Amino acid sequence: MQKTELDDQKLVEEIARRIREILELLGENPEREGLKETPERVAKALLEMTSGLRTPPPQIKVFNLGDDGEVYEKNQIVLIKDVNFSSLCEHHMLPIIGKIHVAYIVSNSGKVAGFSKIIRIVNYYSSRLQIQERLVEQIADAIMNSEIKPKGVMVIGNAIHMCSYVRGVKDKEAKLVSVAYRGLFKTNRALQNHVFRLLDNANKVNLL
C-alpha cells in the first residue's frame, strides 16, 4: 500500500469516528443495523467531494488551430455548454447541483483548450466547500491565466442549492445564476449577449 493510501485511510478513520459522534448527538445509535457502515461511507463521500483541496489543479492541454507562429485573428468564440457539476455549499455543507457554461475567445496565437480539460477545471474547483459566485470566478481565472491565453472568458453557473431546497425557505423552484467575465467580455455587452444567444439557440437544437 502506498503512503498516500495509508494517509487516506487514516483520514477516513478519523472522519468516520467524528461522524459516529455526530450520530450519537443526534440521538441515533451508530451501531444499529443500517448505520454501522454509514460513518465510513460519509467519510469517503466527503473526501471525494472535497478532493480539489488536496490535489494539484489540472493542466490545460493546448492545441493550435493554425501553423506555429501564424497569427489567428478570427476572434472565434468557443462555447462548452451544460457541464454538469455538484459541490458542497460552505454554509450548510449541503449539495449545489447544476450546470456550468464556459465561453472563451481564441487568442491571436490560435491556441485552444482540450475539451475534457475544461470539464476537469470545473470539477476541480467544484470539489470543495464552495459558493457558486466564487466558483465561476475561479473557473474564469484558471482559463484566462492558462497557456491558451484567450482574449476573453465568460463563465455562467446555473444551479439549485439544497440549503434552500430542503431547509429554511424550502423553495423547490429557485435557481441561482452567476456570471463571471474576463478580458473582452468584461466591457463588451455585444459579446456577452452573443454568448447568451448561442446558449439559447443551442438549447433549441437536439443533436442526439
From Swiss-Prot:
It is an enzyme of class 3 (hydrolase). One of its GO terms (biological process) is tetrahydrobiopterin biosynthetic process. InterPro entries: GTP-CH-I_C/QueF, GTP-CH-I_N, GTP_CycHdrlase_I, GTP_CycHdrlase_I_CS, GTP_CycHdrlase_I_dom. GO terms for molecular function: GTP binding; GTP cyclohydrolase I activity; zinc ion binding. GO terms for cellular component: cytoplasm. Zn(2+) binds at residues 89, 92, 163. It comes from the Archaea. It catalyses: GTP + H2O = 7,8-dihydroneopterin 3'-triphosphate + formate + H(+). Pfam families: GTP_cyclohydroI. Keywords: GTP-binding, Hydrolase, Metal-binding, Nucleotide-binding, One-carbon metabolism, Zinc. Its EC number is 3.5.4.16. The keyword Zinc applies. Toroid-shaped homodecamer, composed of two pentamers of five dimers. This is GTP cyclohydrolase 1. It comes from Saccharolobus solfataricus (strain ATCC 35092 / DSM 1617 / JCM 11322 / P2) (Sulfolobus solfataricus).
